[in-house]
Amino acid sequence: MPEKIQLSPAKAKCLPRSDQLVVISDGVYEGDAVEGVRYPSPEHMSGWWLTTDRYDGDIKSLKTVHFYHIAQFRPDLNDFLGLAFGYRFFSGDGRTWFDQKVADSEP
């Protein structure tokens, strides 16, 4: 069962570096509820894929941005973004859960 957790900044040890890349859909910068999943990734990528209800399944519509842009425009997501590889979250209700299949995927 997904649970609600809140990470304090001190506990968010897996926060991406500001120069790492994040994949986002339309609606992320606009403040929509976000579904996030963090995949094991190469060093230049944070592993985070952030989508909203505006995402239509077309990967060509996704954008790659630096983490510092997300931290600036969506500070409400910062605690979630400190979760380790394999985690998922839904910002709309604060649920977080671990997905072993995601954690085991190849970078």
Where are these regions (language model features)?
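Fe(II)/2-oxoglutarate
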Residues: 1-3
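Short helix/strand-capping turn motifs
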Residues: 5-57, 65-67
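A short local loop/turn or secondary-structure capping micro-motif enriched for an aromatic residue
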Residues: 58-59, 107
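Short, conserved acidic/polar surface loops in the N-terminal third of protein domains
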Residues: 62
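Short, compact, well-ordered microdomains
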Residues: 66-106
